[in-house]
Amino acid sequence: MVHRVTVGWDGSAVALAPLEWAARHYPDAGSFELVQVDGGRRSRGEPLQDVEDAAEAFRQAHPSFEVSAVHAQGAVAEVLADRTAPDALLVLGGRGNEEQRLGHRTSTAYRVLLRAEGPAAVVPQSFRGGRDVVVGIAGPNDDPCVLLSAAKEAVSRRQRLVAVHVARPLLGLGLGALPGDPIGHDRDLSEYERMVDAALAPVAAAHPTLPIVRRVVRGRTADVLLAASRNAALLVIGRDDASPIDRRPITHSSVLLSRAPVVVVPPGTEVD
């Protein structure tokens, strides 16, 4: 369960989307806090609202929530990452203009996601809703918290869970398959499907009535996940802390280009 929701606030219209999104989907969170990093970069040409005023307006709109406003000093990514925890959710805004997002190769949101000690979400300003919760399955060594977190999101939204594993054969060949060998190709896919079933076993046990769709797709991981979640309500992906920071393009691409909100779940995230 998410016990606290922290929303990064920069006073712009981009910050409004994650705030309302969080209120809608996490009504049982114990508290909401809006964090404004004073001196941080703001969006040019947009009307700005101070964090205190924003917190008061949010409190008036949602009187059942405990709401606090925080002024902080320092580097934006570091300040926000320091406020994360395994039982809390950090929510950030994302640009709605895809071309504009393409230019931000080292986005603040991405830097926060790399350091966060708990789950963190990026909500595109242009998001208007969708169907299904899509989750990426990297392999048999995935932390169970990733799939269980995605399942819980699907249950709370009354949506299907669409579990996607992207098979990336070495040098274009399936494991144990020869070029043009359909039997080897089918055997390769069946092995991946068994792995997906095994990974989803804890989810099926915890949520026996949850509709689950299993997909094994060949292609580039980022492209497949973005296509699968194009009209989704949510995309959930795990964070591989074993990979070097400069070799995590999947999370980066998803944050920059996803049309759906993205939740990145680090190892050790608490799931009730």
Predicted regions and their residues:
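Extended, non-globular alpha-helical segments
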Residues: G103-S126, P179-G180, G184-R187
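Short conserved AdoMet
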Residues: P27-D28, T84-A85, E117, V155-S156, ...
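N-terminal membrane-targeting/anchoring modules of bacterial envelope and secretion proteins
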Residues: H3-W9, A15-D28, F32-V35, G39-R41, ...
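Small/aliphatic-rich secondary-structure junction motif
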Residues: M1-G45, D132-I183, A204-A205, P211-I212, ...
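Short beta-strand elements of ligand-binding domains
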Residues: V91-G94, P119-Q125, V262-P267
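Glycine-rich, Arg-bearing micro-motifs that act as flexible, cationic patches
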Residues: A69, L92-R111, G130, R230, ...
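Structured core of small recognition/catalytic domains
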Residues: R160-H252, P261
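Structural beta-alpha unit
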Residues: V14, G39, R59-L90, N97-E99, ...
